[in-house]
Amino acid sequence: MEIGQYQPNLDGDGLRIGIVQSRFNEPVCNGLADACIEELERLGVTGEDVLLVTVPGALEIPLALQKLAESGQFDALIALGAVIRGETYHFELVSNESGSGISRIALDFGIPVANAVLTTENDEQAVARMTEKGRDAARTAVEMANLAVALEQLDGDEDDEGEGEDDEEERA
């Protein structure tokens, strides 16, 4: 049996990307952002098509993502942050709630959101992961933005089946 398969598309030309970056654990978050923006540029996304917004911490990321999603100006969003375990339960709370909120934005608004909020046991782990995770977030955002467009076109193709010429004139 032969099946259709979508090939990943990492061409960022013309894509508009919104980035929300936490300022808490700032050196790590800046490293994430630098790697992410560098990779977006390598993939063909221009600086004028990227908006970087900073927020105090990981718990504030979902609201900023929501506002960007509501604007309708972006093809994909990226969340950047670092939650590093301390000696209290706060780590679990921040990790779980920020992750849940980020996922909810993607589903509620139908927009790809690449989640690069690191959750690590210590500073060393965060520093070791920040560059590759920043790059990965850029690739994920571009790939998913292109996939979303391709899948939306599938939906449009199904709507066209069986329509007459009158329907085509209405869309023109």
Swiss-Prot record:
Keyword Protein biosynthesis: no
Annotated Pfam families: DMRL_synthase
UniProt function note: Catalyzes the formation of 6,7-dimethyl-8-ribityllumazine by condensation of 5-amino-6-(D-ribitylamino)uracil with 3,4-dihydroxy-2-butanone 4-phosphate. This is the penultimate step in the biosynthesis of riboflavin.
Pathway stated in the Swiss-Prot or TrEMBL entry: Cofactor biosynthesis; riboflavin biosynthesis; riboflavin from 2-hydroxy-3-oxobutyl phosphate and 5-amino-6-(D-ribitylamino)uracil: step 1/2
Entries under InterPro entries matching the protein: LS, LS/RS, LS/RS_sf
UniProt GO cellular component terms: cytosol; riboflavin synthase complex
Binding site for (2S)-2-hydroxy-3-oxobutyl phosphate: E87, T88, R129
Binding site for 5-amino-6-(D-ribitylamino)uracil: F24, A58, L59, E60, A82, V83, I84, N115
Protein name: 6,7-dimethyl-8-ribityllumazine synthase
Catalytic function, reaction form: (2S)-2-hydroxy-3-oxobutyl phosphate + 5-amino-6-(D-ribitylamino)uracil = 6,7-dimethyl-8-(1-D-ribityl)lumazine + phosphate + 2 H2O + H(+)
Disulfide pairings: none
Keywords: Riboflavin biosynthesis, Transferase
Keyword Transferase: yes
GO biological process: one example: riboflavin biosynthetic process
Family in the record: Belongs to the DMRL synthase family.
Entry's Gene Ontology molecular function annotations: 6,7-dimethyl-8-ribityllumazine synthase activity
Segments of skewed composition (Acidic residues): 154-172
Annotated stretches, region: Disordered: 150-172
EC number: 2.5.1.78
Active site: H90 (proton donor)
